[in-house]
Amino acid sequence: RTAILKLISQCDVFITNNRLKSLVRAGLDYDSLKDRFPKLIYGLVTGYGQTGPDVDAPGYDGVAFFSRSGMLADMAEPGGYPASAPGCVGDGATGAALFGGICAALLNRERTGMGDFVETSLFGNAVWLCGTMSAFEQYGYHYPKKRSEMGALYTFYKCKDGEWLHLAVTQHDRYWKPLAEALNVPELAEDERFKNAALISRNRAQLIPLLEQAFSQFDYDEIAARLRERDIVFDRMRHYRELATDPQAVANGFVKEHIYENGHSFMMAMLPVHMRNMDETGTGRGPQMGEHTDEILKQYGYSEEAILRLKEAKAVKQHP
């Protein structure tokens, strides 16, 4: 604890994802530190928030973010298996929220000289991101949905070559007729059942199979060209494995090659924010647990003997 307090005394921001009860027990919670370090920005990530019945519950991305929010259950069709949670997506969203809060707290400290406590949680971020769906539920628009209950012009269709296309038409009056023409079914736009947006929504269960049949007559590349000509919003449903080589991702620097010390390389996802007047962040791996322990402790005046004693007491660890 003494070593940690030395680090805190000279840092701008202290970040932890330990549970509150553990922090209180160690005397490292915000209330225990704020008077001693009034300029400290204290960042805390929790699973479920600062209070409530689950305040001390452990939480991971797949559980506190995806499962608790309803994302996994309600992205699947009724009666089917829940969707699989993609790894670390909730962690990334929560980290971005914490980053924004810390930046705001640092700016406020520049103005007032005071530090602050910045807290965010996996569950809280999931609730925020699913706020639209939560509102829909309160107004009678329920999940999960069968395919026949989805918007006929804002859903996915399978092409002749097996590729899936996600269609996203929201301006029905502008794009419904061009879409029907692109699919070689212009008569659908004149059909009394589908003459306007209200009728398309009301009769979507009848329209979806007709559009499924129409899309099944085209390979993806062919129908994609026809849709682009008409400025219709769509994209191919792709796979994680394609991200590393996606031409658009590469062109924009969304992925960059990183070479490890052992010579192995891979395409690393980069921060999705670019600034013209600041240097871009390069690629690089995160440090191993305890990789810089000796280096940091020496910076704070610890001798080799003192560091060895800390290791023997298992108070710190240096990665091999």
Task: Describe the predicted segments one by one.
Residues 229-281:
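A glycine-rich dinucleotide-binding beta-alpha-beta segment and adjacent secondary-structure elements
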Residues 305-320:
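Amphipathic terminal alpha-helices
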